[in-house]
């Protein structure tokens, strides 16, 4: 995916989050110049647990049909070390008619809360 497409997707998602009163931490809007100035040690949990934005087409090339935009607020680390959390908190944006593939985690819990008002279809 081209950077321009990713930027457009993120802009649309930010607007959607704003409309639904979803507030993200300040680092959600850091430009690259600000990231480069950070003390990596002070921000190690953000880097280690890959907190922040994800835009994915799940290996395909049709984001509109099969894709997902999400912001990871909290995340557990493998086997609980060094960050002892068994859950993840992710704010996801799935567009109309967009599908996300099934997946599961052996050692992580996730709550799914539909705040956008769309139809959420879950297959168990």
Model-based region annotation:
Residues 70, 91-93, 111:
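Conserved hydrophobic/aromatic beta-strand scaffold that supports enzyme active sites
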Residues 84, 92-95:
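Structural recognition of beta-strand segments within beta-rich domains
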Residues 1-88, 101:
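A short, N-terminal "cap"/entry segment at the start of jelly-roll beta-barrel domains
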Residues 84-86, 105-106, 114:
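Short glycine/proline-enriched turns and hinge-like loops at secondary-structure junctions
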Residues 95-96, 108-110, 114-124:
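Glycine- and acidic-residue-biased ligand/ion/polar-headgroup-sensing regions
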Residues 76-78, 97-110:
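Short secondary-structure capping micro-motifs at structural edges
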């Amino acid at each position: 995916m081209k950077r321009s497409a990713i930027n457009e997707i993120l802009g649309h998602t930010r607007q959607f989050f704003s409309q639904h009163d979803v507030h993200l931490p300040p680092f959600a809007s850091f430009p690259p110049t600000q990231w480069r100035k950070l003390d990596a040690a002070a921000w190690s949990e953000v880097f280690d647990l890959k907190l922040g934005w994800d835009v994915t087409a799940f290996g395909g090339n049709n984001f509109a049909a099969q894709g997902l935009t999400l912001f990871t607020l909290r995340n557990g680390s493998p086997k609980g070390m060094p960050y002892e959390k068994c859950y993840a908190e992710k704010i996801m944006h799935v567009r109309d008619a967009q599908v996300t593939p099934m997946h599961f985690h052996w050692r992580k819990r996730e709550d799914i809360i539909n705040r956008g008002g769309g139809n959420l279809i879950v297959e168990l």
